[in-house]
Amino acid sequence: MFDTLTHGELLKKTAMEVEADIAGIHKQIEEISERNEWRVLQSYRKHKVSDTHFTPSTGYGYDDIGRDTLESIYADVFGGEAGLVRPQIISGTHAISIALFGVLRPGDELLYITGKPYDTLEEIVGVRGGENAGSLKDFQIGYNAVDLTKDGKIDYDAVAAAINPKTKVIGIQRSKGYANRPSFLISEIKEMIRFVKEINENLIVFVDNCYGEFVEELEPCHVGADLMAGSLIKNPGGGLAKTGGYLVGKAKWIEACSYRMTSPGIGREAGASLYSLQEMYQGFFLAPHVVSQSLKGAVFTARFLEKLGFTSNPKWDAKRTDLIQSVEFSDREKMIAFCQAIQFASPINAHVTPYPAYMPGYEDDVIMAAGTFIQGASIELSADGPIRPPYVAYVQGGLTYSHVKNAICSAVDSLMQKQLI
């Protein structure tokens, strides 16, 4: 690869130095992957998965043994009592919406304790967007968010003060998303849950688990979360699931959410799986390994770009809890050029040049470099971000470590050619 780059010799030398630095961390990632894959394998064996479970269902989808067993496996692996895993859940945002509308009722309040959530959730809660769009606000469900401290930690005093008799759901966003703060480790989420449950044990703790599955050995429900949600075109789909989302948690809350997902009186009993089951099963089995490849790529990205003077978050040697690696460019042109170079190093649509543009759910123009086999799949290598200071690109995913390495080296070579670094 390096002999095709303009600055190949320099980049090869730098890459070799980087891989020597990160070898120990890569070993740790592989060990976590092996333990997570063992847990998945044990669950498949426990549930006696066979090729019968891949049989498509049509129409109403009643008595779909493949779908029902997969939901039991998700619950088993992720530490919940029950789960919903459906191709009809179109995204992580949709899964989160089902969770919130499933358990909140008029007069209740949702309190996010990890700061303002993703931009896409602002229209769900009703702080942005038109009236009568069906937001929580339209149903007289309150919303509040507690800002983090200056160093990105939970402000526990402010959380205690914000909890009131109307508070029913505590929202926790595991990944930083587009925010300039650290993502939260499972150990930190465990402490958050302990804290709010001591105030009121009846509070429902919901965790947005997007980008976090299989990064650590435990998931939020293992440490006391009542409900969590995510997307199948992120970590748990293993790069094979073409669409879908999931919810896992306490059985009574999953049942409540199932009525929001379909209809009261129907719940989880219907919903045809069509031809999605085989790829969902195989993708979930591969997910721990694929996530490890993405993580190894993220560590390489951080160390490589830090050596070139860029600011990365998390740092290359920091403990990780999600796939997202942010890189601060402090310059609009550099950020756009980097994302474009990632697109050019992709297997799909490498001939396409992405430009910043409006995207539904986001306040600023966003650039999205995603030459992926599955549209919008964050488990595949992508680079994106809102065009606003300090011009941070969010790099995530990678089905293979070698693709991430090749793409980052190629992107840096492109920036060098343009004399941007």
Swiss-Prot record:
Q: Which gene encodes it?
A: ynbB
Its signal peptide is: none
The highest taxon in the source lineage is Bacteria
Which is one Pfam family of this protein?
Answer: Met_gamma_lyase
This chain belongs to the protein called: Uncharacterized protein YnbB
